Amino acid sequence: TALAITDHGCAYAFPEAAHALSKGDDFKLIFGCEGYLVDDLKEIVVNSNGASLDASYVVFDIETTGFHPSKNKIIEIGAVKVINGEITDRFSEFINPRVPIPFTIERLTGINDAMVCDAPGVEEILPKFLSFCEGCVLVAHNASFDTSFIRYNAEQLGIEFPPTYVDTVGLARFLLPHLGRFKLDTVAKEL
């Protein structure tokens, strides 16, 4: 006699089933798993509160000294505010990270120590940026990266940061699956 067990997207039941049936030799276990090749659980719109892109949104990007919010620093925030389909305001600020910018980041971003040495710190710029964004949906390419840095630094400053945001990487994967690569320049060329 055989018993087939199938889990969906995980293998949590396998050890339990094997243990339960290990006491007797009358059953043969057949394990199966439904796997997901695409992370369709990743949200395109995060913290949706019914806000609409028809009214106003802020498209933004940050540059950092690395890839980990708790270890690396924001060195630039750039954004445009769009109201009723028109760019109505711009935000562009360098931030002094108070640490040297690694050469690899300088090559990647074009931002060097001389460009940020006289800039204000994140404690001055981040509240201005959040004020600029107030009442707007945020939009970014790979938004989880950008918002993780904003969130971490906001927490360090005692500022709440529960925004609604749209990740254009997820949107591009959904709308342009034939691309294969979803770097911002690749998506922009396709559009």
What are these model-predicted stretches?
Residues P102, L126, I150, L184-D185:
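Generic structural marker for isolated residues within well-ordered, non-membrane alpha-helices
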Residues T88, P97, R107-T109, E123, ...:
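Glycine/alanine-rich phosphate-binding loops at beta-alpha junctions
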Residues G158, V187-L191:
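Short, intrinsically disordered, charge-balanced linker/junction segments flanking boundaries
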Residues H68-T104:
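Active-site acidic carboxylates
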